[in-house]
Amino acid sequence: MIPLRSKVTTVGRNAAGARALWRATGTKENEFGKPIVAIVNSYTQFVPGHVHLKNVGDIVADAVRAAGGVPKEFNTIAVDDGIAMGHGGMLYSLPSREIIADSVEYMVNAHTADAMVCISNCDKITPGMLNAAMRLNIPVVFVSGGPMEAGKAVVVDGVAHAPTDLITAISASANDGVDDAGLLAVEQSACPTCGSCSGMFTANSMNCLTEALGLSLPGNGSTLATHSARRALFEKAGETVVKLCERYYGQEDESALPRSIATKKAFENAMALDMAMGGSTNTILHILAAAQEGEVDFDLADIDALSKRVPCLSKVAPNSDYHMEDVHRAGGIPAILGELNRGGLLNKDVHSVFSDDLESWLDEWDIRSGKASEEAIDLFHAAPGGIRTTEAFSTDNRWDSLDTDAENGCIHSIEHAHTADGGLVVLRGNIAPDGAVIKSAGIDEELWTFTGPARVVESQEEAVSVILNKTIQAGEVLVVRYEGPSGGPGMQEMLHPTAFLKGSGLGKKCALLTDGRFSGGSSGLSIGHVSPEAAHGGVIGLIEDGDIITIDIHNRVLDLGVSDEELERRRAAEEASDKPWQPKNRQRVVSKALRAYAKMATSADKGAVRQID
């Protein structure tokens, strides 16, 4: 047997003081010596994806206790990227991932917890907890708060907006054809319930990827926050983590640990899923970071290779009118993985927190397998309630039928793929020798080749001003630099610029290029993660107005039409300037906390993780 980590605080004379304190938290005599399971919650009233989680920890705790564990709950912080968007608050979003990971490590190691159930949901919370799980390598199960229901259709000035979501509201705000009353109607419909925003944005993308990594249960990524079916996921998470404890501590079975589950092959499967479902570009940052935390040899080159052979099987908002509730009706993540598996695109020799092998759990949970269990079929009938609410488990609505249309439905078969390439593409060239990323699933294929003159700005705020003041012209490439992990600092999301371009009618007429990043809600020719970033001496810092930029998604090229000699001349001039590799006219207050992150942050090709050594 492997001794419980918590034994140092619960067993023996030397632990008398710690036991006295444990008793003061409600620990009973017969609980000493049992595995302590940290219920890592993230409840907050600031974030709709987390507002319903206050009592969810109790559900998990009851299940842990019934299975023979000792539950102890704590909370992490949670930043709402949508509320933080478009102002200085967005500087804090990506760095909060590191704070969350550190806080989980601090709490779990300081109190010698034996295992964790991570109750996450929104953009940086799942990645932060995932980084912590890979770092700590103790038994863990992830269970998210679940996606929000899509908003109901609204008609504004004769134009239907159906169904609505956060991106609909932001785009409408920049559309001169939508008056204030129309905008109010859209925003009142856009976010009707608790849960992570309803499209295949960053939060839902990451929660889906935990299924493919093997660290969460089937349905985790797609079962609505409001549906009663989600309660069972929390209960099963509590039961499952205690079983993992028994396997690891009681049977010395290291296959129960996250690093044994989320191996390189599992990371490859997760990114194959990401390509197939057209996930957020932010997932690349977070998957690279998690791999580094778990000492998994998985990098941008691996992602590039996968994107060349895995097709895009599903287009979900912001790239279509489908939302997560539609993905769920089509069989959720098991259905997408099942299609990939039948196409020979998954590694089969992987296991999960609930199953010993991929084939058996896909047989049971893929509604297209012909062998799906009644439990699986029942789960994927869970439908939205259509009632505004902040309460979890508040609806029992059911779909009349499942979406099994592999040609025209929400999830296509490989034979009917949207594109032969994956929904995420890595571009390289003299602008981004270390890579840049674009969500190709959000772009009409006729726009996959684009050439235009650069319009250079040095902040997101300036980019928004250029768009809303209508000084950007069709055919231009808007270059937003010094917004990378170090240069921002914090690598702001450019949701407002992309949404405002779309709302201004330029979404298919301009490109946007940045060393920052994009929201999962961004679409169009939005190229982010340019590496090296400007603050690290990247070529993006040398681009001048009027320089010709070529984007070729088919050939994965991002090129600046400037000679090497001219770039060297510009580089020499930049390095001889008073403030080399810094924005020249930007007014931005940067706090001590953000400056600390900036000093350690790597460029996006490394996951924007902190480099300490």
Swiss-Prot record:
Segment forming the signal sequence: none
Pfam families: ILV_EDD_C (PF24877), ILVD_EDD_N (PF00920)
Transmembrane portions of the chain: none
Catalyses which reaction(s): (2R)-2,3-dihydroxy-3-methylbutanoate = 3-methyl-2-oxobutanoate + H2O; (2R,3R)-2,3-dihydroxy-3-methylpentanoate = (S)-3-methyl-2-oxopentanoate + H2O
Manner of cofactor binding, per the entry note: Binds 1 [2Fe-2S] cluster per subunit. This cluster acts as a Lewis acid cofactor.
GO CC entries: cytosol
Keyword Cell inner membrane: no
InterPro entries: Dihydro-acid_dehy_C (IPR042096), DihydroxyA_deHydtase (IPR004404), DiOHA_6PGluconate_deHydtase_CS (IPR020558), ILV_EDD_C (IPR056740), ILV_EDD_N (IPR000581), IlvD/EDD_N (IPR037237)
List of residues that carry N6-carboxylysine: 124
GO MF terms, alphabetically ordered: 2 iron, 2 sulfur cluster binding; dihydroxy-acid dehydratase activity; magnesium ion binding
Active site location: 519 (proton acceptor)
Listed cofactors: [2Fe-2S] cluster; Mg(2+)
Record-stated family: Belongs to the IlvD/Edd family.
Function: Functions in the biosynthesis of branched-chain amino acids. Catalyzes the dehydration of (2R,3R)-2,3-dihydroxy-3-methylpentanoate (2,3-dihydroxy-3-methylvalerate) into 2-oxo-3-methylpentanoate (2-oxo-3-methylvalerate) and of (2R)-2,3-dihydroxy-3-methylbutanoate (2,3-dihydroxyisovalerate) into 2-oxo-3-methylbutanoate (2-oxoisovalerate), the penultimate precursor to L-isoleucine and L-valine, respectively.
Name of this protein: Dihydroxy-acid dehydratase 1
Native source species: Corynebacterium efficiens (strain DSM 44549 / YS-314 / AJ 12310 / JCM 11189 / NBRC 100395)
Gene for this chain: ilvD1
